[in-house]
């Protein structure tokens, strides 16, 4: 029996390479609308976007306003006459078309799904996240999909975790692990909900001040945290997997 019975996953920066997807989607957007000063615009967009998502996590802005306002602010700075809502829809469509999966994710989820309940907990745009996970072939491994805009609560609020565990029928929080790359949203959020946490430090940053239960540098390390030795011994052997 796995040590953790329920695994809650963030999406961007944890399962999917958001940086690669964002860069490609922005490039398509710049090309489509013929925007100049692209490197400078991309840098400013990312700064504005990060500040607004931080505001979302603090409960200061709603997602539907955020996704348009980031382009309004960008176009104002660069004196661009363009419809922010229209550009945002084009950008989200390009982003949704990307399924940049971190190496080995599908195999890892397949093994973990045999020993635990898996679910997604994300602050991202629901239609974008669902399509990207579908295209990546990952949706089938999850028993639940919990997005902040639908639940009405944003990570790091414990309310989104409470809603997820309630719907999944999970009562013992000691057996739940929140897995993500955001110290503020995922690690602090998981702790707010009384959960063990796993910090995905895929960029190799200094994690000495991150107060997570576990820290990993590649997702495959998660199997050593979740699985018992007997289960680890049967990884890749479907005939013996259910004999443990």
Enumerate the language-model features and the residues they cover.
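N-terminal helical cap/lid subdomain that shapes the substrate entry/recognition surface
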Residues: 2-103
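Catalytic-core regions built around general acid/base machinery
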Residues: 104-115
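Asp-based, Mg2+/Mn2+-dependent phosphohydrolase catalytic module
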Residues: 1-7, 20, 110, 121, ...
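Short, well-ordered coil loops that connect the C-terminus of an alpha-helix to the N-terminus
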Residues: 35, 80, 114, 170-171
């Amino acid at each position: 029996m796995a040590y953790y019975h329920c695994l809650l996953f963030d999406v961007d920066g944890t399962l999917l390479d958001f940086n690669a997807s964002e860069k490609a989607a922005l490039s398509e957007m710049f090309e489509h609308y013929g925007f100049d000063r692209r490197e400078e615009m991309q840098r400013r967009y990312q700064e504005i976007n990060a500040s607004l998502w931080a505001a979302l996590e603090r409960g200061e802005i709603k997602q539907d306003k955020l996704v348009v306002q980031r382009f309004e602010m960008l176009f104002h700075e660069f004196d661009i006459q363009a419809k922010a809502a229209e550009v945002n829809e084009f950008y989200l469509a390009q982003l949704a078309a990307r399924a940049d999966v971190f190496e080995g994710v599908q195999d890892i989820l397949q093994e973990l799904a045999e020993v635990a309940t898996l679910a997604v907990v994300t602050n991202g745009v629901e239609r974008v996240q669902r399509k990207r996970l579908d295209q990546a072939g990952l949706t089938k491994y999850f028993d639940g999909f919990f997005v902040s805009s639908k639940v009405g609560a944003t990570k790091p609020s414990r309310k989104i975790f409470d809603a997820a565990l309630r719907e999944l029928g999970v009562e013992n929080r000691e057996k739940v692990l929140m897995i993500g790359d955001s110290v503020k949203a995922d690690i602090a959020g998981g702790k707010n909900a009384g959960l063990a946490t796993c910090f995905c430090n895929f960029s190799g940053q200094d994690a000495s001040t991150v107060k997570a239960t576990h820290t990993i540098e590649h997702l495959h390390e998660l199997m050593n945290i979740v699985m018992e030795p007997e289960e680890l011994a049967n990884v890749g052997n479907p005939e013996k997997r259910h004999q443990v």
